[in-house]
A protein has these predicted regions:
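Conserved beta-strand hairpin/beta-sheet module of binuclear metal-dependent hydrolase folds
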Residues: 1-44, 150-164
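Short, flexible loop segments at the rims of nucleotide/cofactor-binding pockets, characterized by
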Residues: 2-6, 26-29, 49-52, 135-141, ...
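Short alpha-helical
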Residues: 12, 32, 56-57, 81, ...
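Divalent metal-coordination and catalytic microenvironments
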Residues: 17, 27, 37, 53, ...
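Residue-level marker for buried hydrophobic side chains located in beta-strands
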Residues: 24-26, 50, 73, 158, ...
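Metallo-beta-lactamase
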Residues: 135-211
């Protein structure tokens, strides 16, 4: 049985999945939470860090944690370049909420600073993470970013920022390609999971996505 720990890091969620003494960390949050996450990881034999996409609020601690724990990192194919060059991020806000998120993110000079690291793995649709001790399947969920991915663990789906749950489940408030984001939302609904876990916001039963406005 897979154990799940939700690591709340301000407005960002990281997830620790564990089974039979092996753990995988999903996303790494921002600088101020690195010691909190490191302490949890040290107690849980984390073998891999998976990054759902290449935005700073999800990858700022990847280099630090990878070095401290001596473990590999993985990111979706297509997002690796965001690690090295924030200027290529062609993200657009959706509505007032999206504009507000973008404004406050850019107001923090540290937000776009990411310590460099070279991902050990580039993940794509259908990849399995069994070699790290957990039966997780990778799903490609482009839209928010080109290389956004999710992870399926039995009835649980971890969607990163492919969907958000700030006030209610919705498409991402920021995206590179809205049409792709809509396709990814439809794909998530079609996966048949029971619980959806977001990069931002509380988890919901999958049936709540039936009223998603696309």
């Amino acid at each position: 049985m897979v154990r799940l720990k939700i690591i709340k890091c301000g407005g960002v969620n990281c997830y620790l999945l564990s089974r039979n003494g092996n753990s995988i960390l999903i996303d790494t949050a921002t600088y101020k939470y690195r010691d909190k996450i490191l302490d949890i990881c040290k107690k849980n034999n984390v073998r891999l860090i998976v990054l759902t996409h290449g935005h700073p609020d999800h990858i700022q601690n990847a280099a630090f944690l990878s070095s401290e724990l001596d473990i590999p990192t993985a990111i979706g194919e297509g997002d690796e370049d965001l690690i090295f060059d924030r200027n290529i991020d062609n993200i657009k806000p959706d509505g007032l909420m999206g504009k507000a998120i973008m404004f406050f993110s850019n107001a923090d000079p540290k937000f776009n600073v990411v310590p460099l690291f070279m991902p050990s793995m580039l993940l794509k649709e259908g990849d399995s993470l069994k070699e790290f001790g957990l039966d997780l399947k990778v799903v490609s969920l482009p839209g928010h970013t080109k290389g956004s991915i999710g992870l399926v663990s039995g009835p649980s789906i971890f969607v990163g920022d492919a969907l958000m749950n700030i006030f209610a489940p919705s498409l991402p408030k920021l995206y590179e390609d809205r049409d792709e984001a809509v396709k990814s939302a439809i794909k998530i609904i079609g996966l048949g999971g029971k619980k959806i876990y977001f990069g931002h916001g509380n988890p919901v039963d999958a049936k709540e996505l039936e009223s998603l406005q696309l």
